[in-house]
Amino acid sequence: MASEEADREAQAARANLADLPTDADVQELGARSASWLVAQADGGYTIQLIVYTERSAALAYVRRQKNRRDFAMFKTLSQGRTVYVISYGYYASQSAADAAAAELPAEVGRIEPWVRPIGSVKTAISSIAQD
């Protein structure tokens, strides 16, 4: 009985992660949403660019970018507060992500990019319901 309940809970958790709602505002801008990040292979990396506390500011940042398809936005919790994270690209290896981080387009702005494992991003995404 307990095993069946644990199996149901595990299935529900996987389903919730797989069925994250897409972020229509982000997709309308031509960028990627949390569901795209969740669909990427666990061994990969993305480049975290910037974190905003206001959704409108995060969307405005994406709007300013030329090639929005390279950008993704997701919501997570940081120190108990909702924040909006902008990341750039998906890379199969850390070395590929490091090389891309060193060559970011000028419109990204003066930032300190963080090469972040996709597994870590997926954990952050699962901490809060996406819009």
List the predicted regions and their residue ranges.
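Intrinsically disordered, low-complexity, repeat-rich polar/charged segments
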Residues: 1-8
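Active-site-flanking beta-strand signature of metal-NTP-handling nucleotidyl enzymes
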Residues: 44-49
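Extracytoplasmic
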Residues: 10, 19-42, 53-85, 90-131
